[in-house]
Amino acid sequence: MFSLQDICRKHLFQVPDAFDEYILQALGLYWEKHGSLQRIRKDAVFVQRNLTISTNEALRIAASEGNERVINLLLSWEGNFHYVIIGALEGNRYDLIHKYGSQIKDYHMILSSIQNANTFEKCHELSNCDMWCLIDNAIKYNMLSILQKHRNFLTEELENQEFFETACEEQKYDIVLWMGQTLLLDEPKFIFDTAFKMVDFSLLTIGYSLLFDNKMDIQDDLTSLLTEHLEIAAAKGQLYFMLETLKHGGDVNFEVLSKAVENDHRKILDYFIRRQQYLSREDIENLLLSAITNCASKKTLNLLLSYLNYSIKNITEKIVQHVIKGGDYTIIILLKKKKINLVEPVLTGFIDHYYGNCFIENFIREFAIRPEKVIKMAARKGKLNMIIEFLNEKYVHKDDLGTIFKLLKNLVCTMKHKKGKETLLILIHEIYRAIHLDTKEKFKLLRFYVMHDATIQFLSMCKDCFNLAGFKPFVLECLDIAIKKNHPNMIENIEILSKYE
């Protein structure tokens, strides 16, 4: 059962000024050698009415003095009992450690709250762990003096390397510097790997400090190492890392900036290309081609084009090839705005490489290209399947076959390319088989075949029309057309056909 006095001590946040030392002692609110003690917040106390300190700090001091009455009071004020252990260690109060230690599951949990290296080490001893555990925790909690104290234990390169890596990853700069200057390390370059990975400029500068003060034994050629660092920084968009590296050597060449292009880091490109001593015009042209391949943003492409003054005569063909190969035509859009039109050669390339119908649709929509032009281009390349897919996408209903039929006939009439005509005539005949034509329309189609010298299609259709009324005189009419058009093969076949009549 709690007494009224206990309840008052726990919940009284403001002690009346009229309370003298005797009353405060009676209430248990007096701290020997310090004065009055009152709670002013959940996490702070007021000592002698003029000093504010945290509850945990007061608990640490009280424990170091062995004052259990004040300890109990502060614990009732929500103090952390970890600070009882810390204070007890500072004051060598092992009776308190014995009393409160049973509440501690793992003494490692307390280490983060300890500022004093000696207390830190004493606390770690309570865990009954080995020296390597102490070193590892000393690194974790930035206790350099503990590492310096136990320097003689750090003799194995592989073990040191592990500790060094931990220090780098934990970003304990003083420890990293001391280890790099003092210990034998298996892979000292790890500091650079971590610096780039964590984007830690301080680690990078420490690494270079160790490297160029001859404290770091690296087998690589320094120029190669610095170039590698420049490439990594360019790929990650870390301009300040590049500038720091350049203080020590290295060269920003095409290979370095190509990494910036691949990852669309425009700020780096602008910074170094503006300083023309780094790159030739040919290098910038090659960077532009790399940007096309890597689907760079419009801003990056425009930046590179601006440094070429939009003059691309030397690489026009290469631009077309890179666009066709990669499938990203953003550069073509930008160039067209500058009156440089590469749309047709690129479209031809896309058709050659049989890009998907959806892709072609998007392309012709972007550049307002008429579908008839695409069909003609595909026909010239003999891409029959592509034409079929394209038409199926555009004309999705079966009723549209008649429309397609008329469209293809019109295209044949305006096409001069022989192979292109043959491709379209094959498709026209396939559609003829799928739709219904009356006698008049059939004769009209036969006449169309004769005019365009489509002998195979003509003969195939004649088999279907052989028994139609008026077919014989119509064949003679077709012969006249073939003679006028000078189609020898067609003439020969019609003459043979007329004999069977």
UniProtKB/Swiss-Prot annotation:
Superkingdom classification of source: Viruses
Function as written in the Swiss-Prot or TrEMBL entry: Plays a role in virus cell tropism, and may be required for efficient virus replication in macrophages.
Database matches in InterPro entries: MGF_505
Identification of the protein by name: Protein MGF 505-4R
Induction text: Expressed in the early phase of the viral replicative cycle.
Keywords: Early protein
Family under the similarity heading: Belongs to the asfivirus MGF 505 family.
Taxonomic source organism: African swine fever virus (isolate Tick/South Africa/Pretoriuskop Pr4/1996)
